[in-house]
């Protein structure tokens, strides 16, 4: 299993078309847990490599469970999820103790923290669904640790040293060190479970939209070389997974037409019906799954939320044979010419939100997109049309004190 890549789109695609496979995968995860004491991260040839970051098995399990795909032992799965989250790997001991990973002690500290925070939200969601409030509270608090590495001055997630100071000098264009196969630009927007909280850290919707525009429009060049960084538009990198959700974030700030325009550009420029027609490598299905979902007019920004964010379909007609035996037909009028959504209807009922739920899709029927060659700047602009986000109120950093740290002269009284 490659869990760092396909949890983003491939696994959410399978929950639509092959729930048996999803159950089989999760039961295999639990077999691995029985044998090794931990859920898989990135196993190869029956051995765990620990190559990538996060513990994204929990995303696959929680996403399935919350969608009603449950042919596995949920109690055992939750136990495995918690144990795996507390295993000491790539700075997770610091993450649990302090709420951040010291960048002067561990490499990839920012990327690890951001992905751990999302994974902890997945555990919290599943625990809440199972009625385990204490577990929910523990992990939902941990899921907010992303706040602790956001620098309001630069508006980037940055490496923080053990003494609490930012890693300096800071170059958001530099490859590596605090980031996994990326720069600070590509991890600038990775809080899929709490986009609204992230927006508030940026200063509000206007500032967040400006930052989204910047990643696609900047002419700044990456400093350093990494083979995984391919398919650039500005500092957006389609050839590697951390960027894959970014184009869809305009749906959270009332400018969905920008998602529609950019997702179409990515579909047209990053995929070609030729040998080596995919930018980057296939990454165990993720690159293709992004294309499939996006060409259907859907994307799973936050697996575990039970929502798919909307964009313009690529084809006039797509027929999806759902796992429950029903059929979903997606229709769009002249999508090669018309790239903007004016109206969305499911079985004749208008959908005014910028997302659609899993249950609605699995009901089957006809999902019709009415399109135009001009952006509709009135649809999907209201706050209530935005997709799921955990935070609805203002957020603050989580403080910590360690008696072993000597940061002050004299004495410290707590």
Residue ranges and their predicted role:
Residues 2-8, 16, 58, 68-329, ...:
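Active-site core of glycosidic bond-cleaving carbohydrate-active enzymes
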Residues 12:
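Active-site alpha-helical elements of protease catalytic centers
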Residues 19-44, 220-223:
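Active-site-surrounding "flap" and adjacent substrate/cofactor-binding loops of secreted or lumenal enzymes
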Residues 22-27, 32, 47-53, 64, ...:
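Mobile, glycine-rich extracellular loop/lid and propeptide segments
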Residues 35, 46-47, 325, 392:
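Short, intrinsically disordered/low-complexity patches at protein termini
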Residues 272, 302-305, 309-411:
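Beta-rich accessory regions
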């Amino acid at each position: 299993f490659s869990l760092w890549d396909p949890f983003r789109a491939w696994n959410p695609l399978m929950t639509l078309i092959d729930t048996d496979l999803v159950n089989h995968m999760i039961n295999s995860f639990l077999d691995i847990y029985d044998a090794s004491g931990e859920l898989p991260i990135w196993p190869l040839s029956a051995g765990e490599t620990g190559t990538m970051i996060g513990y994204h098995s929990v995303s696959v399990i929680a996403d399935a469970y919350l969608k009603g795909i449950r042919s596995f032992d949920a109690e055992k799965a939750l136990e495995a999820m918690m144990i795996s989250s507390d295993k000491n790997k790539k700075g997770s001991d610091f993450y649990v103790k302090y709420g951040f990973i010291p960048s002067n002690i561990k490499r990839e500290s920012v990327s690890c923290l951001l992905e751990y925070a999302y994974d902890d939200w997945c555990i919290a969601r599943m625990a809440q669904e199972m009625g385990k409030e204490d577990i929910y509270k523990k992990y939902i608090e941990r899921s907010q640790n992303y706040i602790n590495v956001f620098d309001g001055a630069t508006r980037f997630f940055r490496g923080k040293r053990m003494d609490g100071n930012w890693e300096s000098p800071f170059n958001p264009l530099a490859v590596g060190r605090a980031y996994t196969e990326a720069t600070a630009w590509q991890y600038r927007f990775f809080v899929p479970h709490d986009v609204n909280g992230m927006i508030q850290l940026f200063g509000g919707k206007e500032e967040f939209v400006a930052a989204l525009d910047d990643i696609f429009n900047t002419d700044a060049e990456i400093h350093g070389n990494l083979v995984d960084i391919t398919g650039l538009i500005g500092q957006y990198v389609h050839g590697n997974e951390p960027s894959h959700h970014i184009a869809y974030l305009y749906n959270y700030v009332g400018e969905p037409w920008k998602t529609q325009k950019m997702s179409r550009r990515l579909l047209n420029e990053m995929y070609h019906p030729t040998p080596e027609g995919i930018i980057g490598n296939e990454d165990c299905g993720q690159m293709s799954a992004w294309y499939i979902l996006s060409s259907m007019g859907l994307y799973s920004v936050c697996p575990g939320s039970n929502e798919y964010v909307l964009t313009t379909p690529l084809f006039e007609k797509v027929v999806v044979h759902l796992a429950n035996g029903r059929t979903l037909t997606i229709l769009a009028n002249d999508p090669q010419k018309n790239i903007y959504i004016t109206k969305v209807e499911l079985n004749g009922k208008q959908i005014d939100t910028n997302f659609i739920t899993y249950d609605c899709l699995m009901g089957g029927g006809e999902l019709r997109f009415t399109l135009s060659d001009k952006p509709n700047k009135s649809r999907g602009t209201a706050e209530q049309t935005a997709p799921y986000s955990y935070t609805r109120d203002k957020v603050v950093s989580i403080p910590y004190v360690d008696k072993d740290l000597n940061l002050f002269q004299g004495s410290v009284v707590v």
